[in-house]
Amino acid sequence: MSYPATNIRLLITHREADESTIILAEGLAALPDFEVYMTREGIASAVVERGVTYLPSPPITGKVNLSVCRLLRRYMRQYHFTHTYSPGSSGLSNALLAILFSTVKNIAYRGTGARIRRTDPTYYLGILNPRVHHIVCETEHVAAYLRSFFSPSKLTVATKPFSLPWADEALRSPIELPELQGKSLRLVMVANNRGRPFKGLHTLLEAMLLLRDDRIGLTLVGDYDEQERLFVQSSPIAPNILFLGERPEAMRYMAAADVYVLPSWRDASPRVVREAMSLSLPTIVSDIPGSRDLILPGETGLLAPAQDPEALAKAILWMLEHPDERRAMGRLGRERIARDFSPERYTEIFADLFRSLAV
């Protein structure tokens, strides 16, 4: 759909902009009909980087921060913004207060399907505020939940992007582990598991114990609870599992694997699955919202019911017994990242949305 050319002046309010938000800001700033501004802590005056104007701001914390609201209001008068985009809840509530009695359109972001309570007044400072013109949802699952609160026309699904060049360096220099040499199937899981049983590490370890197959090796990158290591240490599968702890170049360990496994009970939209797909790794993920929205079951990976070691073991065994098919899955996964999760596509979705709201 085409919209009339309009000079869109966009302010992005966020305490700590993540990589996806910066990519979005720079992508929009490169378009001829956009001027993009973003709040940033720790600078004394406005600076321009890659087309984005960064405006000094104190930390945007709390639902109502009067100093932030006054500053945003001053920026509104100075730069004549037409839209604000708020990827975080504090940025959203303070931006909504700042645009009172103005025609500025506010766009919010929702990355989780966590319950919204109509009886909780704090939600009306943010996502339930009637001055929120549109909501960008991280996944279709999030959008489906929000349809019980909002018209579908008020919702857009835009899953955060991943750029293939980010993975290419890891592919050029994978970290091979001598302990896994000779294994027919090298699994990898990258996650911060300590104090997070919902990441499903124990389910994966139980699946490995059910298999008891010396042809299969598992590398665990990230922190973990000590009882998980002790569980493995006292089992017959101990030689097949490596607890590496936190490592700065996790993708290089992933690049040396054959299959990525994420057995979470819950997850929003795990970036690590996109990383794995960009590395041409087939994936085994839990059949839960978020993870299952990223893969194409049977094409780029397999689904297994959450908290089901037997089903997970079956999926791992399938990967072991079908090496050609799993490699084809990996290639299709990388193609899916390039096609459906590119920064260019992500920017295009937002550009079309902002233009439509300017009409």
Regions found by a protein language model. Name each.
Residues 282-285, 295:
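Short hydrophobic beta-strand element within catalytic cores of glycosyltransferases
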